[in-house]
Amino acid sequence: MPDHQEGEGRRVTAANRRAVGNLGEDLAAEYLHRAGYEVLDRNFYTRYGELDLVARTPEDDLAFIEVKYRTSASDGGGVAAVGPRKLRRIRTLAGLWLEQNREGVQFSGGLRVDVIDVGPDGVREHVEGVW
């Protein structure tokens, strides 16, 4: 008789989620670098949440980037997972990031929020300026 419960091998743990999140962020950061972006920060944590990536765009905008890793595009993809509540949180976090990094970052463009949908084979979609 097996010494584990059925389905135990499929249990998602915080460590697994973090590892998958890191993989998605690594793939997104590589994609951004190839596209001419400069990644300025990763995993900016506050009590309000986390910004996945902050990058200066080739046009000198400052982009606050939410990375969504999904194993299948059939579930609506990562972009569909970012609704109004998540956008409000990202805007709050962006303001906090700017307060803490005001001296160290220079950009001549605007501010925006992007979403990058990542799957097992890499970046599927990059939506610029969702806000």
Swiss-Prot record:
Family per record: Belongs to the UPF0102 family.
Protein name: UPF0102 protein jk1180
Organism: Corynebacterium jeikeium (strain K411)
Organism domain of life: Bacteria
HAMAP family: UPF0102
GO terms, molecular function: nucleic acid binding
Signal peptide feature range: none
SS bonds (residue pairs): none
Pfam families, per the entry: UPF0102
